[in-house]
C-alpha cells in the first residue's frame, strides 16, 4: 500500500485554502477580535488544561453554534465576517472544521497549526485569562 490516504488528501485540500494561525500569533489574533473556539473533548481539556479566553464548543455541534443564521448560534457570532480560529488537540480536525465553517459563509474561519499541543509546546501565553464557557446545542 503506497501513496496518500483519502483523509490525508482531504486534509491537504482543506489546508490549501486556509490561512492557518501559528501558535506564536494566537494572542495577536485574539487581541484583534478573533473568536477562539476550543473543540477538544472534555477529557483532553481536563488532562492538558483549558485555553483561557476561548469559547468551548463540542465538535459535533460546532456548525450550529457558529452559524449566525442558526437559532442555536452563540452570542459572540452576529455575522459571517468575524475571524474564527478553531483549536483542536493537534491541528487535524480543526482544519476540517474551519473548512466546514467557511462553507457556511464564515470566510475568515481558520485553525491553529498544531492545535493545543503546539501551543503548549511553544509555552506561549496564548490568550489573556478569561472565563471559559462550555457550549452545547
Language model segments and positions:
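Rhodanese-like catalytic fold shared by cysteine-dependent sulfurtransferases
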Residues: 1-35, 42-83, 92-137
Amino acid at each position: 500500500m503506497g501513496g496518500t490516504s483519502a483523509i490525508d488528501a482531504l486534509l491537504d485540500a482543506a489546508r490549501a485554502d486556509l490561512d492557518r494561525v501559528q501558535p506564536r500569533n494566537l494572542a495577536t489574533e485574539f487581541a484583534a477580535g478573533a473568536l477562539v473556539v476550543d473543540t477538544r473533548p472534555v477529557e483532553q481539556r481536563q488532562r492538558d488544561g483549558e485555553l483561557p479566553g476561548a469559547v468551548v464548543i463540542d465538535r459535533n455541534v460546532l456548525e450550529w453554534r457558529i452559524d449566525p443564521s442558526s437559532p442555536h448560534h452563540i452570542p459572540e457570532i452576529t455575522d459571517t465576517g468575524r475571524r474564527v480560529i478553531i483549536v483542536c488537540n493537534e491541528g487535524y480536525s480543526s482544519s476540517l472544521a474551519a473548512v466546514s465553517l467557511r462553507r457556511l459563509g464564515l470566510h475568515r474561519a481558520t485553525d491553529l497549526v498544531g492545535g493545543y499541543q503546539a501551543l503548549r509546546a511553544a509555552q506561549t501565553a496564548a490568550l489573556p485569562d478569561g472565563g471559559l464557557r462550555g457550549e452545547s446545542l
